Amino acid sequence: MTLRSQSVEQSSPHQTAGFADSIKPQLQCGIQRALISVIITTYNRTDALNAVLRALAAQTDRGFEVVVADDGSDQQTAQLLEPWSASFVRLGHVWHEHRNFRAAEIRNRAILQSCGELCVFLDGDCIPRPNFIQAHRRLAEPGWFVAGNRVLLSRQLTERILADHLEPELWALRQWVEARLRGDINRLQPLLSLPLGPLRRLGGAAWRSIRSANLAIGRADLLRVDGFDAAFSGWGREDSDLVLRLMHSGTRRKDGRFATAVLHLWHAENDRSRLAVNDLLLHAAFRDGRTKAQIGLSSL
């Protein structure tokens, strides 16, 4: 059965008996050392989310749970998740009412509902390849977060993948070379697999250009900085703020390139009207050497 938690800021028109009403999400399990928690953000895009869940269900490493961090989708998302529940160790669904873009807050709610010692953040339009979990497990190390990367897919290729239920996560390199020649992907290099070894630690203090679309962080490191900062609302900079505070607290970056790349389905550009405000918040965190979120996990 899919486990669901709903933040009751006010009653939702999509509420059903399947939702457990709770103002403050409560952890539903003990922390499990070998378990990875994959936290997927989504908002009203069930076709893309279905492709992501399909790819996760076929992972070579099965020791993970999935918690869907739902920024206020309609009931179709809950209906999509129910049949997938048998495919994972545990499938959780954390929902709050949609009020602008609140990825930081819903990720925090999902963290509180997760059980793994390692949290892997993944966007609901980013398809992982079969060894995604295995690679993140291999790279995980206390005191280091792993910044993965992505390949951007064109609108035309995205529409074909979703309409025809294609499985690009299983494509051979030759198919990706052809896609690159057609202009259907922005780059090919992330799809190559390289060991890199100690070279992955060379950019330990680099915090720019890291995206929470593919980011792995130890639970202890997340708790130390109080998670994401829900002061960031609207699109942009909440992931940069988290990374910056992690580094201020002593956590360092490990490069996940050539090991953990995901396939980012095309979508229209998000509303960026709050970006200037979020830039100011990020600048303040940088200037003040802040480690703790202003509105973090402890506020829930």
Question: What does each model-identified segment do?
Answer:
Residues 50, 75-83, 131:
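Acidic helix N-cap motif at the loop->helix transition within catalytic regions
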Residues 54-63:
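Short, acidic, metal-binding catalytic loop of nucleotide-sugar glycosyltransferases
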Residues 63-75, 92-96:
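Short beta-strand/loop segment that forms part of the nucleotide-sugar
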Residues 97-114, 131:
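Glycine-rich, basic loop-to-helix element that forms the pyrophosphate-binding segment
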